Amino acid sequence: MDVSRIRFFRLMTGDFAHGISIPEKVAEIFSGQITKGFNLKSPSGETWRVGVAKVADELILKSGWEDFAKAHELQENDLLFFTCNGHGNGSCSFDVLIFDASGCEKVSCFFTGKKNSYMCKNFNSIGGQVAGQYLSSDSEDTSTPSVLIGSPHKASTSKKLSGKTKTNPRKEPEDPNCSHWHVIEEKNTDDDEHADYHYTRFANYLTGEERDEIFSLVSLQPGNPVFVVVLQTAHVRRRNILIVPTRFAADHLERKSHDILLIRPNRKQKWSVKYYYLSNTTRGFNCHRWIKFIRENRLREGNVCIFELMKGARRPTMTVHVIGKADNRFVLLG
């Protein structure tokens, strides 16, 4: 049998938190070939090394499995689906999908992060043109996930600057699960007409001139809170997420998961998407309804999306203004 075609699932029952067995037929295929363990790629994109042990006649995922189970908050009756994506040198790699007891993919599994890793990415302009390079450090502990490059949830917030300002340093985690903190210089002003405007990390690289050009293209109601996103690959691909800036969510959204209605200017169609509130640092859109919004509005990497929370609406509603670039100029997309 072609090893690369192997797929199997395991239902989390019994003492699953400390180890799970590999199906007998799968274990027979790998007999004598797996000496270094399995590499498990989780929905977050991270890869975990998990050792194998033979107990009686069973092949058990053991060393490192407990860490994997804790990080992904595995519970009784969760279902894990394993798909082989390569093998060799005494190990085998699997993509792992994780479903809860209701049959839905577990959203929390998109947010696992590694504490001993960091990344740095420099941009020279809007549209994802990379000016620098990635920097990463990784622990030698193979039972923990590898460094995650390009994580969609490493985001920070900032406010647009104008008028007379003062600087207030505040601390914010670079990663929802990271023990390392950094200081963000945040500008505050009483006479700033954009005081309620927040920017995700990549949107924060927009220059003042670019921001002025972008906001000149849209009509925003005074007093409505706003956050700005520059779409990355992670936002528009299936099974990925869009993180809502932490400060915006804390100030303007309920501290629980709920539906939010998305509308586009001058269009009758409406989209109800799920807003997930998972912890004090992780909030965002992720589900098939968000993917439907992306697809039906033909959103692309590099688009600038301005999310305007409509005050006074009967239910949580955001108007989404989309800006693209043509001939090196920003244009409003219908």
Swiss-Prot record:
Subcellular localization(s) per the UniProt record: Nucleus
The Gene Ontology terms for molecular function here are: DNA binding
What Gene Ontology cellular component terms go with this record?
nucleus
Q: Which InterPro entries match?
A: B3_DNA-bd, DNA-bd_pseudobarrel_sf, REM16-like
Q: Which UniProt keywords apply?
A: DNA-binding, Nucleus, Repeat, Transcription, Transcription regulation
The superkingdom of the source organism is Eukaryota
Q: Which cysteines are joined by disulfide bonds?
A: none
Q: Which Pfam families match?
A: B3
Main location (coarse class) = nucleus
Could you tell me where the Low complexity compositional bias lies?
A: 154-166
Which PROSITE patterns does the UniProt record give?
B3
Which sections of the sequence are annotated for DNA binding?
5-102, 227-326
Q: Where is this region: Disordered?
A: 142-178
Quote the SMART domains the UniProt record gives. Answer: B3 (SM01019)
Cell inner membrane is among the record's keywords? no
What's the protein name? B3 domain-containing protein LOC_Os12g40090
